[in-house]
């Protein structure tokens, strides 16, 4: 099984998650949609070994990567609206690959909605964006653990807008 992992905000924790996950032998293949330079630089900062592959891998310290370049250089912990298109592009590419059957699902890394909006792109969140990319008119956000499933009545709305959307 191949899972698409969108690394999210390049200056955030998403690349770290991919690198730390890659340190383990695993059953699934995690295909990381990320700038390879971001992964290499972050692995150096974390003092963890990685080898990037552009194919399936399940070996420890190897990262299967679908390369997408950032627009501007990434500084860890420093948000940059100029990389907003990059953040959306990795989600677009992963979604496209899932729809083509190349991946079994998507695991999304954290993004900063405010930074995307600062770039001039109207963005409310992953749920709505994935719905748009897949031409899905109705969506629900679901939180699940063990035997508990919680579907949210609304997503990404200001509190004063909730009652008008239920």
Segments the model singles out, each with a brief description of its role:
Residues 30, 139-140, 148-151:
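Small-molecule pocket liners
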Residues 98, 120, 134-137, 157, ...:
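Short, well-ordered alpha-helical segments in soluble proteins
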Residues 1-126, 165:
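Contiguous, glycine/small-aliphatic-enriched amphipathic segments in soluble metabolic enzymes
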Residues 152-166:
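Glycine-rich phosphate/diphosphate-binding loop of Rossmann-like nucleotide-binding domains
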Residues 118-140:
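Glycine/threonine-rich beta-strand-loop-alpha-helix active-site module
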Residues 59-62, 145-150:
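Beta-strand-turn-beta hairpins that frame and shape the catalytic cleft
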Residues 66-68, 142, 153:
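Hydrophobic residues at beta-strand termini and immediately following loops
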